[in-house]
Amino acid sequence: MAHPEFQVSTGKDDKFYFNLTAKNGLVILSSQGYKEKDGCKTGIASVKKNSSNKRHYERKDSKGGQYYFVLKAANSKVIGKSQMYKTNESSENGIDSIKSNARRAKINYMK
């Protein structure tokens, strides 16, 4: 993969999900399930709009001692969740990756 992209797929529950992948192909943000494809598209547009604003990221610690974050829209609803990171620094690097990749990421509908 030579460019970042939003990979949209349908889950076993027939809902639509997206994963934002970086240039290296690693997933850096995952969505909730959407009942409709248009809802998923709206979620992607919200990620593109809100990803550059550091106030929209909420940093969290897991019970297992790992770090992750959620990206929130202006209305405070969660629009994406990161993977788990072993260090806080790695988590911050994940945020930086989303900031630099989300706006230019293309949408790829998976089969």
What are these regions (language model features)?
Residues 40, 91:
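Alpha-helical recognition helix of canonical C2H2 zinc-finger domains
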Residues 6-9, 15-23, 28-34, 43-47, ...:
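A structural feature that tracks compact, well-ordered secondary-structure segments
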Residues 52-54, 64, 102-105:
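Short, intrinsically disordered/low-complexity patches at protein termini
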Residues 1-4, 104:
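Charged, low-complexity amphipathic helices and coil/IDR segments
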Residues 99-111:
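Glycine-rich beta-strand-turn "strand-cap" elements at beta-sheet edges
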Residues 1, 48-53:
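Short secondary-structure junctions
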